[in-house]
Amino acid sequence: MQPIYQYAWIIPFVPLPVTMSIGLGLLLVPTATKNLRRMWAFPSVSLLSIVMVFSADLSVQQIDGSSIYQYLWSWTINNDFSLEFGHLIDPLTSIMSILITTVGIMVLIYSDKYMSHDQGYLRFFAYMSFSNTSMLGLVTSSNLIQIYIFWELVGMCSYLLIGFWFTRPIAANACQKALVTNRVGDFGLLLGILGLYWITGSFEFRDLFEIFNNLIHNNGVNSLFATLCASLLFAGAVAKSAQFPLHVWLPDAMEGPTPISALIHAATMVAAGIFLVARLLPLFTVIPYIMNLISLIGVITVLLGATLALAQRDIKRSLAYSTMSQLGYIMLAPGIGSYRAALFHLITHAYSKALLFLGSGSIIHSMEPIVGYSPDKSQNMVLMGGLRKYVPITKMTFLLGTLSLCGIPPLACFWSKDEILNDSWLYSPIFAIIACATAGLTAFYMFRTYLLTFEGYLYAHFQNYSGTQNSSFYSISIWGKEEPKLVNRNLLLSTINKNEKVSFFSKKTCKINGNVRNLMRSFSTHFDNKDTSMYPHESDNTMLLPLLVLVLFTLFVGFIGIPFDQGVMGLDILSKWLTPSINLLHQNSNYSVNWYEFATNAFFSVSIAYFGIFIASLLYGSVYLFFQNLELINSFVKIGPKRIFLDQIINVIYNWSYNRGYIDVFYATSLTKGIRGLAKLTHFFDRRVIDGIMNGVGVSSFFVGEGIKYLGGGRISSYLFVYLSYVSIFLLIYIFFFRKVESIKLFQTKNGIPLYL
């Protein structure tokens, strides 16, 4: 056993000193800590880099054939109950550690510049370091109790990060929504853990799997109860990984800063649910109903996430629903028995999605000086377009991330997604058809996002910022894209008088086709003899460096799953890496597929992706804009019943997507209003009934006491008289009532009448 394994317990705690130091600094020497705030990025990156090197060494040891290592120490020693803590090092742990640290380092470097202007800079890095600590603790946990502790810490960190700008009501509501939604899954996870302990008497993974499998095979446990416990465990993963129907928190989580979105969607919170399913898969595999449930939830999430992304205008929300759909693929894979493909896609998707989110942050950063610092404008793709000329490096990196997510070879996601699609055909043709159709939808909405952002014109220059637009000046294309029709660019880009000092937009008005409209001045504003460009600008090198590094991962990380062994797949790095875990699942560790079969299946999936890209290019690309500007569409396509029916279908799809499938509305009307109504009813019952009884007894006692006080007059003889009077009355009632009852019983006995009559 390598000595490095003995020190693996330190992995989760290495980033923690940053959080503690920032907290103590703000508490003891707040002024000095705030003045030196930019220095905290360096220790954050440095400490996480140490963990990355440590994790890389562990990964190399795993690939070279090291076995699973577990170290435990007892927390409590009792004859009836034993609780042990420790760390578990296996391929799954090493994979997750590499993902968390590499993506985390890129996000921290990026955030140093992105958050430099923010007053919460120190708080941001404290939260980020604590989030990395929580996630590293989760993936190294050796039992379910540790899993649950760090699971809750990850949820708390996501709450703090999503609500980072808590003074904004939308952000405050978003973090509360994420917390409440995840509490549903967390409660199920807790019940499932307690149920499994009741069945097996152990929290340790190895003991738990062995005992549970023996009980299932020997019918030693009620199958319905075992299925219920496993379903409750899976509920925790459903909520944390934003699977249907507990996915509603994910798009609202975009209210946090963009680096937080990259970290949550790539390597931390949403990956935690996938990690839990992968960790407990040996338990799930012995219950066929759970495997069917996992695959069903996965395929529903795949399709739902893709359809909800079709009409989003916010660039971050579009990527959020993309994450939801891709997580559906990752959840589908273990459900159909494809453990290797699930972890493969988890790796490739993490780097591609981190690249896309950080790229979107660069885009937002470049748009904010033009449209303002409101997320409703700076993240709105309707106001973007034509950015390829202004942010070429961001454009190149975003395009590569988009193509990777579309499944275009030789980029990373192609290899992993294609493996899932191939395995789905072996499991269920229906699931395979849905997965393949969603691959086309993925290519469509991802390329739609790219085209709306980087192609065409910069539509912010054609927008008046009162929130309205000239109807004749605009042509609204399919699903929210605003396009100029026969625009005189010289008129729109007319220059201002250099002797004037004005705000961003002129108050002059001019006539355009008979309509009065605010005329935008030249996008160069003069402040104190200094020209400030009002076009987007490329981000700082500190923000571009992580993008370029993630591009390298996107280009080459897919090769870890590609064999180089004369045509039969089975000797690739990933298969060697996962051999101990696959053997634990009692599967054949030699993953072999003929290259000819692989190429045939890949051709089909790539064709679907290219078809989606082609449709997106037709609807949002330069070809569509060319025909629209020449007004040739209506010349060739006559408006008839078929055209009207097609438009109605498009409107239905658009409304479904834009309104989030009406799922949020359903929850708001049924659950939220129902719970509030129940709370009001409970409040009424508590105040009027319970408190009414208590208050009524008190008031009655008060009046009785007052009456007796006035009746007695304060003399002892009067009190004795009243007391004797009450005693006499009770004696008379007793004599009259009980004597009458005894007489009736005696009469019945003498006459032979049953006593119960």
UniProtKB/Swiss-Prot annotation:
The chain crosses the membrane at residues 9-29, 40-60, 89-109, 122-139, 147-167, 185-205, 219-239, 258-278, 280-300, 327-347, 354-374, 396-416, 425-445, 544-564, 607-627, 692-712, 718-738. It catalyses: a plastoquinone + NADH + (n+1) H(+)(in) = a plastoquinol + NAD(+) + n H(+)(out); a plastoquinone + NADPH + (n+1) H(+)(in) = a plastoquinol + NADP(+) + n H(+)(out). It is an enzyme of class 7 (translocase). The keyword Hydrolase does not apply. NDH is composed of at least 16 different subunits, 5 of which are encoded in the nucleus. The gene is ndhF. Belongs to the complex I subunit 5 family. One of its GO terms (cellular component) is chloroplast thylakoid membrane. Its EC number is 7.1.1.-. GO terms for molecular function: NADH dehydrogenase (ubiquinone) activity; quinone binding. NDH shuttles electrons from NAD(P)H:plastoquinone, via FMN and iron-sulfur (Fe-S) centers, to quinones in the photosynthetic chain and possibly in a chloroplast respiratory chain. The immediate electron acceptor for the enzyme in this species is believed to be plastoquinone. Couples the redox reaction to proton translocation, and thus conserves the redox energy in a proton gradient. Disulfide bonds: none annotated. It comes from the Eukaryota. GO terms for biological process: ATP synthesis coupled electron transport; electron transport coupled proton transport. Its main location: plastid. The keyword Transport applies. Keywords: Chloroplast, Membrane, NAD, NADP, Plastid, Plastoquinone, Quinone, Thylakoid, Translocase, Transmembrane, Transmembrane helix, Transport. It is a multi-pass membrane protein. Pfam families: Proton_antipo_C (PF01010), Proton_antipo_M (PF00361), Proton_antipo_N (PF00662). This is NAD(P)H-quinone oxidoreductase subunit 5, chloroplastic.
